[in-house]
């Protein structure tokens, strides 16, 4: 699942930085079904970044700042994903979401996570690849 990939990458970064996470964290990413980008209007990768911020900030529906931080993260990731346009590419959207989250965590939590250099090698396998419009296309 796409959200599992984004979630997993971000949590791996936390582990490297010795940031403690609640045990049920990874289960949240599994709750986002495939295809939500087209059917719900919100990419699962973008949603996962908000879940990630929710967990590291201790957000709940009743908390002020953490709740806002989580929702702002989701909106930033979805804006970055949506700005490129479709059709969807789960790899591209995951990369964009991860980079958005890394930047957001640095900005809002003063935590520096390793930002990957990404060059896509999958365009030949994706009939809907947008090629030059994709920031990761080789």
What is the predicted role of each segment?
Residues 25-39, 70-85, 119-129:
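Short, mixed-charge aromatic SLiMs
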Residues 1, 111-138:
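Cysteine-cluster motifs in flexible loop/terminal segments that predominantly coordinate metals
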Residues 15, 105-109:
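Secondary-structure transition/hinge residues
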Residues 45-52, 90-97, 116-119:
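Short alpha-helical linear motifs
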Residues 3-15, 19-63, 67, 71:
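Conserved mixed alpha/beta catalytic, RNA-binding, or beta-rich assembly cores of soluble enzyme
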Residues 56, 63-106:
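A structural-propensity feature for long, helix-poor, extended segments
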């Amino acid at each position: 699942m796409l959200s599992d990939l984004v979630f997993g990458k971000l949590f791996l970064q936390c582990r490297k930085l010795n940031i403690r996470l609640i045990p049920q964290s990874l289960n949240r990413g599994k709750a986002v079904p495939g295809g939500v980008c087209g059917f719900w209007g919100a990419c699962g990768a973008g949603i996962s970044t908000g879940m990630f911020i929710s967990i590291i900030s201790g957000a709940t529906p009743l908390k002020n700042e953490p709740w806002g931080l989580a929702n702002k993260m989701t909106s930033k990731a979805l804006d970055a994903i949506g700005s490129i346009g479709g059709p969807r590419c789960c790899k591209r959207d995951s990369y964009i979401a991860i980079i958005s989250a890394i930047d957001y965590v640095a900005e809002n939590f003063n935590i520096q996570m390793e930002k990957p250099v990404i060059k896509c090698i999958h365009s030949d396998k994706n009939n809907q690849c947008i090629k030059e419009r994709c920031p990761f296309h080789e």
